[in-house]
Amino acid sequence: MAQQELELQENFLNKDTEYNQLNNSKSQILNEEIEYQIGKQKIFRLSIAFMTLFTAYGSCTSLISGLYKTLNFTNLGLMSLFSTYFTFAFASFVAKGIIQKFSFRVVFTISNLGYTACIAAGIWVFMCEGSEQSGFCSVEAIYSIVNFTAALCGICASTLWVAQGGYVDILSSTCPSKRGVLIGYFFSFMSASNIIGYILASILLNFFGNMSYFLLNSVLSLVSAYMMYVLPDPYSPNIKSQNDNRNKQQIKPLKEQIKEVLVLLKDKKALYLIPYYWLVGVILGCYASYIFVVVKYSLNEEQVQYAPQYVSYVVIFLGLSGVICGIVVGKLADKYNLLILAIGATLLVTTAIIFSLLGLIVKEYALCFLIAILWGCCDSTNSSLQVIIASKDFPGQLQMFSLQKLANSLGCSFALIMGILLQSYPPYCILFIVFLFQIISTICLAVLLSLKNTENKV
């Protein structure tokens, strides 16, 4: 009888423990779902602000080379982009310290103004159209103003994007099972800026002219600055200690901030990711100027003078493919191995290169749309995955986002320099350079995957 009572008591205690565990599990799932919904709303507001900014700035960067060429400023567009990404690279070292000193919304807003100045420089250039090339309209003055504002934009871009990485990382850390969805959600909105930007560009350039194009984009950029200023704090109200700890952090000297970024190079995981981050930058620098070239090849003599408008039609499809890929990749990233997905994304670059070569041979305008779709997939997929990998493998480490943006911007700068130096060579030369970096990054990702699999077995 006593034994039966003991067994009943044990069964009761076991059931009570199971019941408590079940309740805790349900409570945890419910809390994560609440955090996800809160995070989703904040990501939505951040995404809309970024989408508005890059609706203005994104189309300018792709069309600026062709637009400035119409005024016989042959390399001004590519030089300004190089100035942006070169300063972006080195400003990334100090971005973390600036972000620690100010709130996210202040960093976003001030950084936004650098983009606005860069866009507004286009107004200056086209104000001088038809004027004598002297004084503020001299070639030297125009090159100086455009490159100065481009360099300022690069400095601001470093704080903007490192802050974006930190903001999204904080939100996704409260619901790790939805990390990929949230980051993919952001980049799908970023790709949507291409669609809106180039539709806007095609209307303005066709019916109102270049001056109106830069004026409206400058206004849009200022609107996005206000959106960023009213952004909510990323920290969860349920985890107030996060914000308190952040505010107590001391701002380290510049030398120590640089050391923090460089010390990551001793980490094998970070070291093998650098070629991949470099490739993402090379892709951006390549398609920003290459799509204009491949479209121009497909046009006849009468159509060439309207090349910027034809480019804007094509890049709308680049944005559309980016939106779809951003959503799909975000969902896949929460279910499958990130490194395997990244390897697949680098192989997608090879497909884009093959069709880009075909576009130069066939010289068919319709094929340019498929080429743009492929480059849009490459850009959005790899941009999303690099942030998800950094956020998952290096949680809470802003210096990893600094290293990522450093490699991105150096890769992009390299591609832009090659674009200028290889102008007298056939256009396919730049594609072979991209292919070389694609092979290197794929090999490095495969080695990193092998190392991780070995660690997991041990």
Task: Give residue spans per PLM region.
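Glycine-rich segments within core transmembrane alpha-helices of 12-TM secondary carriers
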Residues: L81-A89, C153, A157, P176-N206, ...
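Transmembrane alpha-helices of Major Facilitator/SLC transporters
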Residues: F88-S92, S289, Y310-D334, A345-A352, ...
